[in-house]
Amino acid sequence: MIKRVHLGQGRADEILDLPNLIEIQLNSYEKFLQLDKLKNKKPLLNEGLESVFRNIFPIKSGNGDVALEYERYYIENDTLNFTEKECKRKGQSYEAVLKVRLNLQFLTTGEIRQKDVYMGTIPLMTERGTFIINGAERVIVSQIHRSPGVVFYKEKDLYSARIIPYRGSWLEFEIDSKKDYLYVKIDRKKRILITLFLRALGFDTREKIIETFYNIKKIKVEEGTKRDLPGQYLAKSINIRENMYYRAGDKITLQDVEDFLQNGVNEIELVDFDGYNDVSGKYFVSSNVILNCLEKEDAFFALKDGSKELPKESVMLAVYGALFPGEPISIDNAENDLKTIFFSERRYDLGRVGRYKLSKKFGSDDLSTSVLTMDDIVNTISHLLRIYEGHDILDDIDHLGNRRVRSVGELLTNIYKGAMSRVEKIAKDRMSNKEVFNLKPQELISVKPIVSAVKEFFATSQLSQFMDQVNPLAELTHKRRLNALGPGGLSRDRAGFEVRDVHYTHYGRMCPIETPEGPNIGLIVSLATYSRVNDYGFLETPYRKVVNGEVTNELEYLSAIDEEKKCIAQANAAFNSDGKYLEDLVSVRISGDYTTTNPKNIDYMDVSPRQLISVSSALIPFLEHNDANRALMGSNMQRQAVPLLFPKPPIVGTGMESVVAKDSGVVVKAKRSGEVILATSNKIVVKPFESENVKDLDEYHIVKYERTNQDTCFNQSVLVKEGQKVERGEIIADGPATRYGELALGNNLLLGVIPWNGFNYEDAILISDRIVKEDLYTSIHIKEFSIEVRETKLGPEKVTGDIPNVSEKILNKLDENGIIRIGTYVKPGDILVGKVTPKSEGDITPEFRLLTSIFGEKAKDVKNNSLKVPHGTEGTVIDVQRITKEDVGNLSPGVEEILKVYVAKKRKLKEGDKMAGRHGNKGVVAKILPVEDMPYLADGTPLDICLNPLGVPSRMNIGQLMESQLGLAGKYLSESYNVPVFESATNEQIQEKLKKAGFNPTSKEILYDGYTGEPFENEVMVGVIYMLKLHHLVDDKMHARSTGPYSLVSQQPLGGKAQFGGQRLGEMEVWALEAYGAAHTLQELLTVKSDDMSGRVKIYENIVKGVPTNVSGIPESFNVLMQELRGLGLDLSIYDDNGNQVPLTEKEEELINKS
């Protein structure tokens, strides 16, 4: 391991170690499958797969005679056909068989038939948090979506409340502030007046509705109060006699008061608008919205004042008609239907989270009811009205209390839920159809829906992604990603600015820096370093508790909901050894506000300064001195760094390098403490101390030169020697882009910040030849080429070295089976696997047919269908795989075997390759200069790299300068530094180190010109900077074409490297040539070099024969235009100067010749 010096303003030790960085994946999947708990036969009943089976079973037949009951499920580990390594080599999925023990119970006879039923296979997660599907490693990205529960928000003049369930119908309330009416919508259908909805749910009288929402006051009716009563609303109906009936909710007039007095009504109950807060625990409202709705009912049903209440039929007709327009209605059914929509567990499920959110919002303790209750509906309406009146505040939809994370386990649970409900339906059908008493449990269960749903999810879901495997950091970040897109999430086009923006609740939960540039900005984010997902799916972050102004070592994880209104101090607030703050005013944050306060008011304190950013951002030293946009680019570009052959860890690190290497899964860690008894290049054997058994050894297999998903090279190298003692968890072998157990994405280079003859203009980079010679930026890239050998209708294809019409020189590289030999250097066009296919009858000439009929089969010809090296690829063949049906058991139909050839290429750094630092300072190598021509220091040391000083001021990434200064000191003092993010080294500390190393405190030195030996006019800033080579290599982009494929309709060359296309000559280029009057150049570009078919062939012949050429025909695009005009019904023909018709197609030519 490297010894690092801690250099910064904070303490070297952290109060809380970083968690396992991929635990979000591992924990979620373990919760789903519960493998550890299955061993003890005690799975949690309401988690994952167990909960799915418990909810679906028992399945009962329609008549109730037969029931299919569930006992338990188990995973058959011995059914793993292949290990992880074999799955990758053979293109298989790493999965195990899922079996469920079912009891088929005949309730009439009491007989029980038990059987373990096959339920398909289930992909298993590797210990690195990935899945292997069809031979490729994939990651299931966590999705961040709107949490179930209730949300209150305002759009234009509408105040709305939405109750969003986990599964079921959405319920939406809205107040139209212009008209003061409250409506309800179910599943975004037609809106219904709230009072009608309440009546349909059982609040069938006006009195019930009023006493639910309003405080009621009793008032004596006497001469003294007579003047105050008119204009107030009755809360209880008053029935004096037949034609004197006063309804609750009606406004009192002066005449009414007189009637009361005359008829001996001494006391009446009125709506008390002002007393909305008088009763504790009750949330009454103070506006007359509900009363307006009652009034509107009268208008809606044209009631006469005399009639007392709305008949139930009218209410049901109105509500049901809006919900299910055009369906026939029976009142009892309508009532049942309405109840089942919200109150039946089969149709509606708030989920644990939805219930938790509702209880939290309305202050109830109920955490178990999964359906809506009448209280929920009443509370929601009251709360919405109180917001409308200004007594409560709206919700913030982008608050992390209203967004939650669904990880692998939950996504898979939902897939299984959907599949199992189809299985249930099929089972019920089979129970009713067949002779039930002859049935076995396995005959009732159809596995198809499960198998296809799981396959579809892993293979095609938007959240199941091909793992980004460029380097260990890319792998790790991919597993910690949160995606707002995908099924049930947002879509790119509809996501507005607010959803994408940074929110104050992201602090310590989601990284404000790391997100892609482009259309997905803010929709795909990264988990912060200490963040974790709680049982409800909300993101939590740890804090230290502060009690009475004293910091304790007690930790508490808070979700965004818990953190609201809490007073939180920063991690670097100064306090003494007793935990007392040193200053009287400490800077804190409360919700979204930043302020200072007395230590007594503080509730919590941050755990670490790097708590609020992600792993990638935490790898950037001096991050706080960079502009946020550049920090974003720096975080994203570290993920694109190619693993090098000889990387070095950075001199200036942040302390995160070893954590990333350890958790990424690319290094080998010792499982138990022990002594190394064998260490070869591909195997380590450790004898554990704890075990007495001589045969109990830990074996570790070292991966050598394997291809990753992105064609980079995965190679591990051993770090231990035989006889060495190792501790548990110690790193015993490095992986790609790691050195001595630390992440090493690039190399440290001696830098001069100086323009050099215009070669580093506009972010270009000038580099010394030493870097290429010493292979500092050489990387290995491995490509896979595969070919299938099929059974065709004319006979099988054959792999053979006997290929027609191929030169001996090319065939020499193949072995006796017609496969390229391992170790051969191949170039474009070389054959990797010789394969011949039987020719179809149509390909055969008449002469050949005659021979076949005379000599039988012998003369049948074959066609060369070999696998060749594509353009732009060369390298050494390092491996050949042959996969046959015997190996795998099932290849796709018609395929006899698959051959894969792996070609590796060493790529040195060259002009056109993209390089970058860790601060978003990216550029393209413009020139590689001989060492002797590079500027050099006073002691003769030539620079490795020259960057343009103009790249710094406008970009505001000063971190690169501070890193270079400290790096220079570190190089000459032979030290490596840990400079933690947000508490990095001060200028004084850096200058101290520079002086110690014998440099100017400004790190500006006199440089000499390599050409002349003269010193440059001004001193130049010199430093040591950490540079990476990115996965944008010039070899992958460079492309040339002479002749190649043409588009079918327009007959113009295709575009793009993948199609081996040509260079586009667009209208602007044509204008430029026209402006120069280059008529002949233009003519040949637009005809023979593009789409004049006959001209192309002729000119090629003439060039081959060496004849001067001047060919011009009709370009195909003209023919296309002609045919399009004919398609419009215009009869067009072309004639030459002599009046002869020019044929456009072969058919026309025949017609003209005939006539």
Swiss-Prot record:
Q: Which gene encodes it?
A: rpoB
Q: Known SUPFAM superfamilies for this protein? A: beta and beta-prime subunits of DNA dependent RNA-polymerase
Q: Which GO terms describe its cellular component?
A: DNA-directed RNA polymerase complex
Homology family: Belongs to the RNA polymerase beta chain family.
Q: Which UniProt keywords apply?
A: DNA-directed RNA polymerase, Nucleotidyltransferase, Transcription, Transferase
Q: What PANTHER family would the database entry show?
A: DNA-DIRECTED RNA POLYMERASE I SUBUNIT 2
Name this polypeptide is given: DNA-directed RNA polymerase subunit beta
Q: What does this protein do?
A: DNA-dependent RNA polymerase catalyzes the transcription of DNA into RNA using the four ribonucleoside triphosphates as substrates.
Catalytic activity field:
RNA(n) + a ribonucleoside 5'-triphosphate = RNA(n+1) + diphosphate
